[in-house]
Every structure is written in C-alpha cells, then in structure tokens.
Amino acid sequence: AAAALAGPPASRAERERVLRAFRAASEAGDFARLVELLAPDVVYVADGGGKATASRTPVRGAERVARLLAAIGVRHPGDRAELVEVNGEPALATYRAGELRWIDTVEIDGGRITAFRRVANPDKLRHAAHR
C-alpha cells in the first residue's frame, strides 16, 4: 500500500543532495540529522554474503536505522565515503584504509530516504571496484 502512495521517483539531483547530506551527518555524528533524513518507515537491508559483517534481517524505522548507522561510524571514525555512480544511479562508496568496504544505495521520497541498501559482500565489491 505504501508503494502505491509513493510519489514520482526522486531526481538524480535530489538523490545526490540527500546522499551528500547523509554523508555530512554521518561524518559529523549528527544523530538528529540522520533521523531527519530517514523516512519514519525506512527499511535498511544489508548484503554481506556471509563473508562480511552485516545485519541478517531488515532494520525498520528511522531511529533504529540511524542508531545502527551511527554505531558503525563510531567504531570506524577513519572511514571515507565518496559519492559514486552504481548502475547509473548515485550511491555512496565507503573506504577503510583505502579499501572499498561497502556501497550504499537509497530510494528517496519527499526528500527522505525510504529504503537503504548496503552491499558489503566482498565478491560483489570486487566486481564493483574493477568496473
């Protein structure tokens, strides 16, 4: 039912704006801003492929997702996130010690992230890094 109520897909410029704001809030440790950028019913899904640490079940809700993402940032303050293109869409690639650790893609509605997908599976990342 929620999908039927969704507006038109966000423009590329809007996705880039939200991803940049998300990156800035993450780097600043601004929990309140992270929550603001996430839709109340946001769903976070991670793919670790059984080879990388990743939540095995979807995480739902802005505060829960923001807490998860903030905790990851606190554990690894040296991470560097860059805006990249994946399958023709804007995404965030996060590097640790120069190595690609994960790629985040999002769906946006009304200026907020409604779906957050993280790929941390090293096999998929190797493929992405060599494209």
What kind of feature is each model-predicted range?
Residues 1-71:
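Solvent-exposed, charged amphipathic helical/linker segments at domain boundaries
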